[in-house]
C-alpha cells in the first residue's frame, strides 16, 4: 500500500515538473518570437500550442484581420497600424516582467483561415483577449470597436482593463505636417515676392474674413484629430455591409465625419450672415449708402424678408442636423431640435 502511495506521489511530481517545463518552454518561445518583432503571426500549430492549450500564465492580445487587398477591408489596415503601435510600445517601454505577462499576436485570414473557422468568425478586424485561465471552449473577451474605437490609446486602455498591464503608447514621428507647413509657407512667401509691388490684397477685409472662417471650420470639424490619428475615410458595417460615414463612438471619428460637421458649421454660419444682413438692410434708412455696400448678398438684391426667412431656415435645419450627429455619437446627449 505504501509503495502504491509513494508511486502515486512520484508520478504526480513528475507530471507537475513536466507541466512546469512545458509552461516555461512556451513562455520562452514567445519571448524569442517577440524579440525579433513585436507581434506573433499565428499559424494553426502556434495557435493551438501558444493560445488555446493549457497551461498558460500569460495573456494573449490577438487581432483577427484580413490585410489582403482582395478581401476589401478598408479599416483592417488602419486598425492593424494602431495595433502595431501598441505592440511596439509594449515591447520597448514595458518592464521585463510585464513583457512576460502580455504578448501580442495577429491572425491574418489569408495565412490561417482555419483559425477563423474555429472561432466562427466571418468579419474583421476583431480584437480578443485570451486570459491565462481561459479554457479552450470558452469565448475570450472582445474589444468593442464600434463603441471604443480602434486607435492605439483605446487598445491600450483595453489591454490595461483586461490584464492590469499599462502600456505607455508612443507614436512614431509623423513628418507630413511639418513638410506641408513648410511648403505652404514657401508658397506664401513666393506669392508675396511676386506681388511685392501691389500688396493691397493683404488689407482686403473680405479675404481675411474668408481665411479666418476657413481656419475656424477646419479646427471645429476635428481635422487636426485626423492628422494626428489617421482614421479611415469611412467604415463598412461587417454585418449589413452598409457604409458608415459617422462613427458611433465619442472616442473615434472618420474623415468623412469631419467634412460633414465642417459643412454643417459653414451652413449655420451662412444662415447667421443672412439674418444679420437682413437686419442691416431693414435698419438702413439711407438707401443710397446702402446700395454701395460691396458684399454678395447686397449685390444679389434679395428682399429683406426673403433673406431673413432663408437665414432662419438654414440655422434651424442645419443646427438640428448637427445636434443629431452629436446624438448619434453619444446616445446620452440630451439635446435635439427638429430631428431625433
Curated annotation (Swiss-Prot):
GO terms for biological process: protein N-linked glycosylation; protein N-linked glycosylation via asparagine. It is a multi-pass membrane protein. Keywords: Disulfide bond, Endoplasmic reticulum, Membrane, Signal, Transmembrane, Transmembrane helix. It is found in: Endoplasmic reticulum membrane. The keyword Oxidoreductase does not apply. Residues 33-164 form the Thioredoxin domain. The keyword Nucleotidyltransferase does not apply. Pfam families: OST3_OST6 (PF04756). Disulfide bonds join 73-76. The chain crosses the membrane at residues 174-194, 206-226, 255-275, 306-326. Belongs to the OST3/OST6 family. This is Probable dolichyl-diphosphooligosaccharide--protein glycosyltransferase subunit 3. It comes from Caenorhabditis elegans.
